[in-house]
A protein has these predicted regions:
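Glycosyltransferase donor-binding loop in the core domain
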Residues: 25, 60, 100-103, 127-130
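A conserved short beta-strand
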Residues: 1-7, 11
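Catalytic active-site module of serine/aspartate enzymes centered on a nucleophile-bearing elbow/loop
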Residues: 116-148
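Short beta-strand/loop motif that positions the catalytic acidic residue
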Residues: 88, 94-96, 100
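Short alpha-helix in the alpha/beta-hydrolase fold that links the catalytic acid
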Residues: 90, 104-113
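Active-site loop/turn elements of alpha/beta-hydrolase fold enzymes
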Residues: 5, 75, 125
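Hydrophobic "lid"/C-terminal helical patch
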Residues: 37, 72, 111, 138, ...
Length: 148
């Protein structure tokens, strides 16, 4: 299963945004990174969900600056993997929050279209952190897919 992801390499704009966040973290302001990212990570209606926001911020804090920097650098170097998707032969579920700003649904539609027989599920009223925002819907999609 592929959740809230894309197969393309970063655009120059995405790389610039990542570099800006890396600079912020390197200046000792890592705790400021996650609050800046929140509107990109979750559906805007969930920004007022204090428990969800606290859980996301705690998760980011526990992952820490070093892992964040490694992740951002790896993503910036990621190659376009679309050419290889047609070779995937295993059952594949592609899931995306319909309001995912970081990896918009069109990227999931693209992936599902390139993987033979892939199933696509778009979760309504959901952003990038679909497993945290809509766990019941994600679990149902995974359960349905695994029992088919």
């Amino acid at each position: 299963a592929l959740l809230d992801t894309g197969a393309r390499a970063d655009t120059p704009e995405q790389t610039t945004r990542r570099r800006d966040l890396i600079k912020l973290a390197d200046r000792g302001e890592f705790k400021a990174v996650s609050p800046k990212l929140l509107p990109l990570l979750i559906h805007l209606d969930r920004l007022s969900d204090a428990m969800l926001v606290a859980e996301i911020l705690a998760m980011a804090d526990s992952v820490g600056k070093d892992a964040f920097l490694r992740q951002q650098n790896a993503i910036m170097r990621r190659a376009d993997s679309r050419p290889g998707l047609s070779a995937i032969e295993c059952p594949t579920l592609v899931v995306c929050g319909r309001e995912d700003v970081l990896t918009p649904p069109d990227l999931s539609v693209e992936i599902a279209g390139l993987i033979p027989g892939a199933e696509l599920v778009l979760v309504e009223d959901c952003g990038h952190l679909s497993t945290m925002e809509c766990p019941e819907e994600i679990n149902a999609a995974l359960r349905n897919w695994m029992t088919c």
